Amino acid sequence: MQILEPQQFATWNEPIEMLYACHSKVKRFCRQLSILPDYLEKHGYTQAVLNDVEQILSYFNRAAPLHHDDEELDFFPQLVKVAPQTQTSIDELEKQHEYLHENWNALSVQLEELISEQRQDIDKHLIERFIQGYDRHIALEEPLFEMGRECLSADILTEMGKHMSARRQVKE
């Protein structure tokens, strides 16, 4: 069931590229989610489904919230300093983060039930709402990434990358 595409090899020294890499993963996982209901109907619950759903759960439970923190705590504040005209879009994106988390919370319940074999299907409308939310979000956000590439200094980007990396370090 997995849809393969070339890996993006960004590093924390390139924080804008890391933000784009996260969006690439979101798009890939959304494509997998979009085919999941039909796949389940035709093939039932398989090891491939289990593997893919576990990856999707892992990403959206861990990496996606960290990505949103990267934006809200590092990228957006730095961008608005040099491009104040972005504030309206940033405000909308932060509201969308809340909506995306709400949609994820509802969808993740069904995915958890699926992998624990408590259900055999997933609500297509829930998946569609989740994917549409991310489609709208990415369409508004990626132009800001481009603006950040053009407007943010190398020093600011380096500092952002350090913060983003530190956010993911295992705390003992």
Swiss-Prot record:
Lineage: superkingdom: Bacteria
InterPro entries: Hemerythrin-like
Protein's recorded name: Uncharacterized protein HI_0243
Native source organism of the sequence: Haemophilus influenzae (strain ATCC 51907 / DSM 11121 / KW20 / Rd)
